[in-house]
Amino acid sequence: MALTKVRGTGAEGLTLASSAPTVTVTNSMTLTDGDIAFASGHGLNFGSTSDVSGMASELLDDYEEGTWTPEIIGDGGNSGQAYQLQQGSYTKTGRQISCMFFIRFQTEGSFSGSYLRLSGFPFTIKSQPQTVHLTALYFTSLGDNYISLGLQAYEGTTSAFIWGKKSATTSREYLGTSDLTNATDLSGSFIYNI
């Protein structure tokens, strides 16, 4: 088989015509600079790998990193909150979202309703399953004596209820609107699907 060497010059580089849409590389390929850009709806296809019976897709078609703004809200509203720190970051790999957050209150403000939620997720939670346990939380300076906190989210939302336990033998309960203070810290990391 003859070897053909193709060199592109100038600002345009190398362009393949639509009559030759496929390029096959028999060995590895190395980019010394630049990126590989995929058209929308395309990506890395892992179709040559073995699958389990429930496999629905082998195409990794999205990746991004960014920030989000976490906040605590009451299920009936809230006002007057001020945060000393309010940080959130996320990584989206396909349909999976990995989030981290840290909140430090400066002024608690007031909350109405019965329960508190962590709000502002960067993407809406997948419609199934209905209820998702997300993570345990780090916390300090609550207005009540909790020994653990966690997040419980529901389909089609961008927030999660905060729940806790006050002893190892008691049932969990959702944090109420009086359970925070001006010195409360909350932080954690969690994963969900969209």
Where are these regions (language model features)?
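Cysteine-clustered segments with highest specificity for TGF-beta superfamily mature ligands
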Residues: 159-174
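Generic beta-strand structural signal
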Residues: 31, 92, 153-155
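Terminal beta-strand-rich extracellular "head" domains
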Residues: 78, 103-158, 162-163
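Hydrophobic residues positioned within well-ordered beta-strands of beta-sheet architectures
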Residues: 99-101, 119, 186-188
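Surface-exposed ligand/attachment interfaces on beta-rich extracellular proteins
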Residues: 13-16, 48-58, 67-93, 104-126, ...
